Regions:
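Conserved helicase C-terminal RecA-like lobe
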Residues: 1-37, 325-326
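Short glycine-/polar-rich loops that comprise or flank the Walker A/P-loop
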Residues: 38-42, 356-359
């Protein structure tokens, strides 16, 4: 709104937030009050970047002060850093950056600070080894319990896992506001709306009007339970929540449309493994050196019965753009859904009452994709592009009957499953035979045994996974200041996630006997 618009609305009695000029007046008053307080001196500073690293311009008052006092020199943090000498801790850090400097020699003369310099020299010369068996028991315990999501953390980098879950170190929090818990909100809606729809006969029996009524009901319920004093929140927060609400309608509409064309039905939500209240027992790996227990929760489990066997698929809601990738699986990453699937195969009978056959895993995009298209795009082209965003990502049992039960048009024109049908009618995509899934289950089991052995042996190597040096997790790691990673120094090394074709992946599993892949 420009100023004329605001004046017109104000004349009509509509209350608006303060205008830009009004806010400027308040800021100037606050600024005047702050500048009038000092009695001896005044230091004015400003950030050059925000918490994400984006460049920031100084506030106008900085330029005003420079014009009022042209003889003042601008000091940068990197020039001199004399202010760091006013406190002992920062001064010692500065001395440690250049051994044998004047500052280093100064602190050498004092017995107390000399001991600190000795400790710094010892730490600088130390090499990252392994934890002793006694240290492992103190840090992790004889029986190590972890969630499935932590498995990916330890496979990404042993040292990062040790810092976060062994030492329980906490990174310095940036001065920024937390983003809204979009994933939690969408999980809540998907679970509760789907459960109510199933109680009313399934998505085929519930039209869109009734479906949207349920969505509204649970949005209001969520706002009342989780967003206290929602009506008193500022206008921007309410706007963002309304926009998220529109996303929720779009996501649930496409989930409903998929399940209307499927014989698989949701059978469990937030199904838990392990813990005191777990529906199913934790996945347990027992070895001579100790035990590893892995628990967690499955967002959704869908099932279909054939020949008295229950075919199950594990569904994970993702508000981001995560894709299932066999290259990651080979490295021990992205195995969370597979772990749950094979655990259900072994333990699911006690919960579902039938023999279990694994039917696959799927990431479901819990987001409303915004398309970037030309202004004169045709409705047909727009629909074709939107269909691409509905494709799930995952790995499915490649039996035609099972795929057709998942999506009735799977063998001719699949819309949701990660499948392709060529002009000759041949089916391809992210599929595997029952034998291949069996070998994959053995591979996941061996990975867990390897992780258990590494934990109990005290492995804390800095060995981050990456596709290239440019995307190494070290660039954004919370523990970089404690790690000092240097590729090739001692046991520090990058582990590259190399691309792999599906046929190569399955061949490696068959020829390697299920041994975890190393690089």
């Amino acid at each position: 709104l420009n100023e004329d618009d605001r004046q017109e609305l104000a004349l009509r009695g509509i209350e608006l937030a303060p205008s830009g000029m009004e806010r400027m007046g308040v800021e100037l008053q606050n600024l005047y009050a702050a500048l009038a307080q000092p009695t001896e001196g005044l230091t004015v500073s400003y950030p050059v970047t925000d918490v994400s690293g984006s460049e920031l311009r100084p506030a106008f008052v900085v330029e005003r002060l420079r014009k009022l006092f042209p003889d003042l020199q601008m000091e940068r943090e990197s020039s001199g850093k004399e202010y760091r000498l006013t406190a002992l801790g920062p001064a010692l850090e500065t001395a440690g950056q250049r051994r044998n400097s004047t500052l280093w020699q100064y602190f050498r003369q004092d017995p107390d600070t000399a001991r600190r310099l000795d400790a710094m020299e010892y730490a600088a010369a130390a090499r990252r080894g392994s934890l002793s068996p006694a240290a492992v028991r103190v840090v992790y315990g004889q029986r190590i319990s972890m969630t499935a999501s932590r498995l990916e953390r330890i496979r990404s980098c042993h040292f990062a896992y040790f810092m976060e879950y062994g030492l329980r170190a906490k990174p310095r929090e940036p001065a920024a506001f937390d983003a809204p818990q979009i994933g939690t909100f969408l999980h809540y809606l998907l679970e509760n709306v789907t459960r109510d729809v199933l109680a009313q006969g399934g998505f085929a029996a519930v039209d869109n009007d009734r479906l949207h009524g349920l969505v509204r009901q649970y949005i209001d319920q969520y706002a009342a339970q989780e967003l206290h004093n929602f009506q008193n929140r500022n206008a921007r927060f309410q706007y963002l929540f309304r926009r998220l609400r529109n996303t929720a309608y779009a996501v649930i509409d496409q989930v409903a449309e998929e399940l209307r064309h499927s014989d698989f039905i949701p059978m469990a939500f937030e199904l838990s493994f392990g813990g005191k209240n777990g529906t199913l027992p934790a996945v347990t790996i027992s070895q001579p050196d100790g035990e590893l227990r892995v628990g967690g929760k499955v967002d959704r489990v869908d099932g279909w019965i054939r020949d008295d066997k229950l075919y199950l698929r594990v569904v994970d809601y993702k508000s981001g753009k995560k894709k299932f990738d066999l290259a990651n699986v080979r490295m021990g990453l992205d195995i969370q859904m597979l772990l749950y699937l094979f655990a259900l195969q072994k333990e699911g009978k006690r919960y579902f009452g039938r023999e279990i056959e694994p039917a696959g895993v799927l990431y479901l995009p819990a987001r409303d994709e915004i398309l970037s298209m030309e202004r004169n795009v045709t409705p047909e082209a727009l629909e074709k592009e939107r269909e691409k965003t509905l494709k799930r990502s995952g790995l499915l049992l490649g039996e035609p009957q099972v795929l057709q039960a998942m999506e009735h048009e799977a063998l001719t024109e699949p819309h949701y499953l990660p499948l392709r049908v060529n002009r000759s009618g041949d089916l391809s995509g992210s599929i595997a035979s029952a034998a291949q899934l069996g070998r994959l289950g053995n591979y996941v089991d061996r990975l867990l045994r390897q992780i258990s052995a590494e934990l109990h042996s005290g492995n804390i190597d800095a060995d981050p996974c990456c596709h290239s040096e440019e995307d190494s997790q070290c660039r954004f790691c919370d523990w970089a200041s404690a790690c000092h990673f240097r590729d090739g120094q001692d046991r520090d090394h990058l582990r590259y996630i190399l691309p792999v074709k599906p046929e190569e992946f399955w061949q490696e599993l068959e020829e390697g006997g299920g041994e975890p892949w190393q690089n």
